[in-house]
Amino acid sequence: MGLNLLPIEMDDIRKRLDREPNEIEWRVIDAVWSEHCSYKSSKIFLKSFSIDSPNVIMGIKDWQDAGAVDIGDGWAIVIKVESHNHPSAIDPFNGAATGVGGIIRDIISKGAKPIALMDMIRVGNLKIRKNVWLLKNIIAGIAAYGNSIGVPVVGGELSFDDTYNDNPLVDVAAIGIVRKDKIKPSIVDKAGLKLVLAGLTGIDGLGGASFASRKLSGEDEIGAVQIADPFAGKIILDITLEIADKVEAIKDLGGGGLAVAVTEMANGLGAIVDIEKIPLRVKNMNPADVIISETQERMLYAVEEKNVEEVCKAFEEYEYPCSVIGEITSEPIIKFRYFGKDLVSLPTNALLEPPKFLWPIKNVRKNVEEKNVDLPLESTIYTVLSHPDLVSKEWVYSQFDYEVNTSTVVKPGDANGAVVSLPNGKLLAIKVDGNPDLCSEDAYECGKGIVAEAYRNLATVGARGMVAVDHLQFGDPKKPEVYYTFVEAIRGIGEATRFFNIPIVGGKVSFYNENSQGKPIKPTPLIVMAGLVQGKLLKNRVEDSSYVVLLGYTRKELGGSLLSKIFKVPSQAPKVRLQEDLLSSEVVIDAINEEKITFAKDISRGGLAASLFNIIVHGYGVEISTKSILSDTDNVVENLFSESSGRFVILTNEPEWIVEKSRSKGIVASIIGKVNKKTSILTIDNTDYDLKTIVNNYFNFLEEVIGNG
């Protein structure tokens, strides 16, 4: 049957049922109990993310399709992150496009209007033509769906590493807006409701949940990839929001198809589904395939009988298929019937409570012998600043209609965080962060670090983080060294979110990100954080003669840094000092509201040098004195490329104000230089380094690589 179930799981369900499941029931169990849908190897740890907060309307405890947070004035935001890694490795266009469609449906399942998307893409070395092909088609798929459906892509991340050569990561986050008293659940609490299905069911995406719960085999798996139809998605979006007041619950048909959607919506009650009533795209489909098909652009609604006609009429006006396929029952049994014959009859609780697994762990944290960095400064600057991770992503943003709906306040690439306007007049900043290189060195510090970095990034536009979702992407959890990094990353994320008092209201776990030889990707957890602008919004601008202020203390911590990755520098990973991140962020927010700064950039990937380069690409030069850097090392390379947390580069005309404000908060700040009109020149300790070639590479690298790919 090609099941992913372990022998222990098969024995477990036999004991619970006191019988042997039939072949179709095995396929249903395989889908519902898949790692993709059940979180059986992670759920016990995810509970540690729960933070009681008066602003949380729907959180991780609720375990629904998206999280929701009160933002005041009767409004709430809905937030979700998802991935389509395995499908994008096989069919990058449809894999990425359906990832966008799926997360939009998660947002509208709460009755919320999607207002922003963010994409996080990681692919392999662009010297390999296949990776160029993957990137082009991933971007094209995201653009095709987002642009067609009218939801702006406002920002994201794009990075490159050999670890993703066979296993690209494609993550999409979405934000929606809804009146908080209009939020819809994805589950029901009473029997007698009719199950209404909108959309056609086809043979695409068969076994997609199971496909996403195993490593890529290198075999023909195209049948497990869903096909995107953004125009149908637009119909689903508009009508779902139109009829939201007429339905009791809404659920997207994602992984596992109807098998999972019906079971989860029933929420401990039961359901009867008549398969012959399901509208089909392909005639004479096998009933078992109908149950687990993951055809896109479908939604399931639980509807009072008196409202069914009105709900279906809304779809009929668009000639979009809509049918009553069953009902919620008081008997806690999930039944799929075909012309009156039971094909599936399984207890709801048995499906919703798969065996939970705690796998062995093996400590892989590295003990590194520190050595002095002895690298030539000039060539090191040129090499690091030329890395593809640091180049402009304008080629990507140009594919997206990021100003559709006119809610985008800060365009992609113009700041460290995206900013959108809300109906209550407030501004919402959004940022995503990940650091797989640091996670490879120390997953615990990485977990703390990505939360802290997202918090700092929001501060650079004047926002304070208030809510987050996470996405945890790892290899096979049964491998002790993989499971160790997973557990450690969760420990770090949990510690940091509790410190900042930021509730994680949802997320995603993606295991089995491995190639056909079983080599796992670098551990790649992500944090998507959102927060309200606290007063004034900072839109970065560079002015001649501005002072360059370095906020925070620099340490000789090069492990997991871009410098270490390129030059194999042995060094300890940075210790994330959350108090320093918090205090330095507060200084930045205060300075923005007092209009004391014109530019703020957190120091992360590429260190201080990369942040200074971010000033230079605006058409200016920068001169600094490394002797002014407050640090535990006098090595110039270490000071320029350390990725110690808690630091910012600030441009100001009142540097002493920044220094004094920092001192009052208990952190350090130093005036290290000035901006000048020497275009593309970085002056370090009175020596000029001409970066014209690097600046040209910054603006043109992606277009040239993609154009030649």
UniProtKB/Swiss-Prot annotation:
Gene3D superfamilies in the cross-refs: PurM-like C-terminal domain, PurM-like, N-terminal domain
UniProt keyword Transferase present: no
Pathway terms, separated by semicolons: Purine metabolism; IMP biosynthesis via de novo pathway; 5-amino-1-(5-phospho-D-ribosyl)imidazole from N(2)-formyl-N(1)-(5-phospho-D-ribosyl)glycinamide: step 1/2
Annotated catalysed reactions: N(2)-formyl-N(1)-(5-phospho-beta-D-ribosyl)glycinamide + L-glutamine + ATP + H2O = 2-formamido-N(1)-(5-O-phospho-beta-D-ribosyl)acetamidine + L-glutamate + ADP + phosphate + H(+)
Chief location category: cytoplasm
Location(s), subcellular: Cytoplasm
Assembly description: Monomer. Part of the FGAM synthase complex composed of 1 PurL, 1 PurQ and 2 PurS subunits.
Protein name: Phosphoribosylformylglycinamidine synthase subunit PurL
Encoding gene (name): purL
